[in-house]
């Protein structure tokens, strides 16, 4: 596998698709530096079709810094730093409105590494920026012109 990652912006302001990395194996220092700078520049990055274990996900996350153990959600077996979000008809999401993660602690996490194991055929949209903030401003300040 090449040392060089392919980074393709998904829009003018946020998001990039990254290929050329195999997250089932540790990234080289050079590859991690490319990934790190892509996260800083694009804020949200996608590394698709990565069949990683919770242990491999934790190892990657640890390269970014200290990890947080969530006090409420269930953890992956043997990996306390990884939470499992399992939603379906009998277990609907409890946070499907706008929210930020773990902002109630003194030093909130700088980010999150998500590994989807099963996705719905529709829905599940993650929105950020103005698409989220406009409706939130309207609900907080109904008399303002947002």
Give short role names for the model-derived ranges:
Residues 2-146:
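Non-heme Fe(II) oxygenase catalytic core, chiefly the N-lobe of the double-stranded beta-helix
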């Amino acid at each position: 596998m090449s040392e060089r990652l392919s980074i393709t912006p998904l829009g003018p302001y946020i998001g990039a698709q990254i290929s050329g990395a195999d997250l089932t194996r540790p990234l080289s220092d050079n590859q991690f530096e490319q990934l790190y700078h892509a996260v800083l520049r694009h804020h949200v990055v996608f590394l698709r079709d990565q069949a990683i274990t919770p242990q491999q996900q934790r190892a990657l996350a640890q390269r970014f810094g200290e990890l947080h153990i969530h006090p409420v959600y269930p953890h992956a077996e043997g990996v306390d730093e990884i939470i499992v979000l399992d939603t379906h008809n009998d277990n609907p999401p409890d946070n499907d409105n706008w929210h930020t993660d773990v902002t109630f602690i003194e030093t909130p996490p700088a980010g999150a590494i998500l590994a989807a194991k099963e996705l719905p055929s529709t829905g599940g949209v993650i929105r950020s920026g103005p698409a989220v903030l406009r409706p939130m401003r309207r609900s907080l300040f109904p008399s303002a012109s947002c």
